[in-house]
Each structure stands twice: as C-alpha cells, then as structure tokens.
C-alpha cells in the first residue's frame, strides 16, 4: 500500500506525526509513505523506515515571491512529483486550508482528513472525501494516531506511541564525556525562560562537573548562547547545525532542558531524558511526548494563557519579590533555577538516564 502524507510544518507537528507512521507500519505490513513537508524540515521524515520518499514543499518561501516561483518552474515540478505515483490514499494530517489545497493536485486518489469539528481550520474538511472525527483536549500525537487508525482501518494501539527512530544510528559513535543540552531558543517571546535563569542553571550544573552545550538557530540565539556560556569553562556554544547535526548532538546527550520548542520534541523523539519548561502553553496538548519526559508547568494564576504577548499586570507584591526587568514573563518565576536544577539532578539519577 502506498500513501501520500501531507504534513508540512511546524517542526514539532512533523515530529508528532512519526508515531502514527509506526502504528501503520506495524498494522499493515509493507505500507509505504511519501511525505509532503516544508523544505526546512525535510530531513526528519527520511529518518523513519516507513517513509519511501520525501517531497519538499516551500510554501513559506514561495509566498514571498509568488511570481518568481511560477516563472522558475518550482511550482510546476512540485505538482508533477505528486502525480508520479498512483497512491492508494492521501492523508492530510495538518487540517489546514494550505495543506488541504495541496491535495487537489494528486488526482482522483481519495483524500482523508479530519472532519469539520476536528480540524484546526474547518473549511479544510471540504477537500476530503473521507473525514473523520478526532476529539480535542488530548495530545497532538494521540490525535494524529487516531486519524491514521481510522483512515487506514486498523485498531488503535493502546501502547505509548513509538517515533520509530533509531537513536544509536543518529548518534555520534563516540560522544565523549557526558554532557547536557540547553534548548533555550523558541518562537513566542512569552515561551522564553528568562535569560538570567538559564545563566544561573548553567553555572549550577557546571559547578557540579557537567558540560553544557548550547545550540542556536538565529543571530539572537547565538548571542544569547554566548552570554550564557561566557566565563564558564564547561559550557560551549555549538556551531550552526542542520537538523541531522542537531539530532546527533541530542542523541548523545545525557539529558536536555528545554522550553516549548521544536527541538525539545526532537529530543523526546530520540528518547533523550528532557525537562521541559512551560509558562503560557499547555504541555497536556503539545508537550514533549514519550518516555523519560518531565514537564514543569507554571501554576501562575493566568497560566497557561496561550498568548504570544504577556498581558499580566504586576502587583505591588510582584514588584517586591521579582526583578521585573530580568524575570519576564512572570509566570516563569514559579519555575526558578533552583527548582529546575533540583528536578534536573533527580532526572540525572534516574535509572533510565544512567546509561
């Protein structure tokens, strides 16, 4: 059986789809998937054994210069690739208009996706011949697994989802001395753990003899990583890495500390013990999923607010207790460096971490 999967972005969403492929491969021997994914994330699907072909799409880039995209033939070549194989089924696991629109170019193959009450953009369901209900209020991994089980007609496994990645294959053959990875970069301003907290945590762990590695993905993140590592002998700022290079670093780590970020989901997919810190977002819906994953969520009165901009107005008590210039957003004051360090040290002593 050959299935075309449309799940273009984001990094976390792409990773959250992998367990559904593992379920399908175990339920239907010989099934193969071709995966339409944003070019920036195209490395990841190829790591799963059930993926036969990766078809990169560049919606983000094409939108910026639509005329050039049409002239240089990229759009035409992309549509041709969708028609090179006679698929048995197309699954749109994104549930957005942009992903549903791409399914129009496959031909007469039936398209499956979420029904109007289950999709993030209800109008997307109009593009599907087979639309299935999947309840909200559960983790994104489980929602995708349920969609695949219905679309491909197999019993939903009761076990925890398996990403299907080979950590040993992706890891460095000789990672050297044990180290920790601090995943300090993320998108929303409100999802950032305060820089002063990262610095204090780095100091604490370096004092205890741990090496700390700091990746980055933008100029701002590189500068922050430099400030976090400054003067700490055991802290190192990594060079710019591809996703494969980042996977190698994560796969060799003893543990990670992460904010709500796509790389935190990659660490979870590689079964790396990870302590994830959540302020405005809800780990129950989009937290790092898998074994050896610990979520610390803020119990601040307004958390999780799911807002990209903090609207909380500090009280007089807040002004007395916290440095409002260095400790923002305030929901993360409930997850201070001492608490995080204590939890991290407990994680490092756990049997599954001592390997």
Swiss-Prot record:
Keywords from the UniProt entry = Cell inner membrane, Cell membrane, Glycosyltransferase, Lipopolysaccharide biosynthesis, Membrane, Transferase
Keyword Cell membrane annotated? yes
**Any miscellaneous information on file?**
Can complement a S.typhimurium mutant lacking this gene.
| Recorded topology in the membrane | Peripheral membrane protein
Quote the EC number. Answer: 2.4.99.23
Query: What GO terms are given for molecular function?
Result: ADP-heptose-lipopolysaccharide heptosyltransferase activity; lipid A-core heptosyltransferase activity
- Relate the protein's function as given in its record: Glycosyltransferase involved in the biosynthesis of the core oligosaccharide region of lipopolysaccharide (LPS). Catalyzes the addition of the first heptose unit to one 3-deoxy-D-manno-octulosonic acid (Kdo) residue of the Kdo2-lipid A module.
Q: Main location per UniProt? A: membrane
Q: Which gene encodes it?
A: waaC
Protein name per Swiss-Prot or TrEMBL: Lipopolysaccharide heptosyltransferase 1
Q: Which family does it belong to?
A: Belongs to the glycosyltransferase 9 family.
Q: Report one GO cellular component.
A: cytosol
- Please verify whether the record's keywords include Transferase: yes
SUPFAM superfamilies per UniProt: UDP-Glycosyltransferase/glycogen phosphorylase
User: So where does ADP-L-glycero-beta-D-manno-heptose get bound?
Assistant: 186-187, 191, 221, 260-262, 265
Q: Which reaction does it catalyse?
A: an alpha-Kdo-(2->4)-alpha-Kdo-(2->6)-lipid A + ADP-L-glycero-beta-D-manno-heptose = an L-alpha-D-Hep-(1->5)-[alpha-Kdo-(2->4)]-alpha-Kdo-(2->6)-lipid A + ADP + H(+)
The pathway where this protein functions is:
Bacterial outer membrane biogenesis; LPS core biosynthesis
Q: Where in the cell is it found?
A: Cell inner membrane
| One GO-annotated biological process of the protein | lipopolysaccharide core region biosynthetic process
* One Pfam match: Glyco_transf_9
């Amino acid at each position: 059986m050959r299935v075309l999967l449309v799940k273009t972005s984001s990094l976390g969403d792409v990773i959250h789809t992998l367990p559904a492929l593992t379920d399908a491969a175990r339920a239907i021997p010989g099934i193969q998937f071709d995966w339409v994914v944003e070019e920036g994330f195209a490395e990841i699907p190829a790591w799963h054994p059930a993926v036969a072909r990766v078809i990169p799409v560049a919606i983000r880039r094409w939108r910026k210069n639509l005329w050039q995209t049409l002239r240089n033939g990229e759009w035409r070549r992309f549509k041709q690739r969708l028609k090179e194989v006679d698929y048995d089924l197309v699954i749109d696991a994104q549930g957005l208009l942009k992903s549903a629109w791409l399914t129009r170019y496959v031909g007469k193959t039936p398209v499956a996706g979420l029904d109007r009450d289950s999709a993030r953009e209800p109008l997307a369901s109009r593009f599907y011949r087979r639309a299935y209900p999947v309840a909200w209020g559960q983790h994104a991994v489980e929602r995708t697994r349920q969609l695949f089980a219905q679309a491909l007609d197999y019993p939903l496994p009761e076990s925890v989802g398996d990403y299907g990645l080979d950590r040993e294959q992706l890891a460095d053959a000789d990672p050297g001395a044990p180290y920790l990875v601090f995943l300090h970069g993320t998108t929303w301003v409100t999802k950032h753990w305060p820089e002063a907290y990262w610095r204090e945590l780095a100091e604490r762990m370096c004092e205890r003899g741990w090496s700390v590695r700091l990746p980055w993905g933008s100029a701002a993140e590189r500068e922050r990583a430099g400030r976090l590592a400054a003067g700490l002998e055991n802290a190192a700022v990594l060079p710019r890495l591809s996703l494969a290079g980042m996977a190698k670093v994560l796969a060799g780590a003893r543990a990670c500390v992460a904010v709500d970020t796509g790389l935190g989901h990659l660490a979870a997919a590689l079964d790396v013990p990870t302590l994830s810190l959540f302020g405005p977002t809800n780990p129950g819906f989009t937290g790092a999923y898998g074994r050896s994953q610990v979520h610390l969520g803020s119990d601040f009165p307004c958390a999780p607010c799911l807002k990209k901009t903090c609207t909380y107005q500090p009280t007089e008590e807040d002004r007395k207790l916290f440095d409002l210039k260095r400790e923002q957003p305030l929901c993360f004051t409930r997850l201070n460096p001492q608490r995080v360090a204590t939890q991290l040290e407990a994680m490092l002593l756990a049997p599954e971490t001592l390997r």
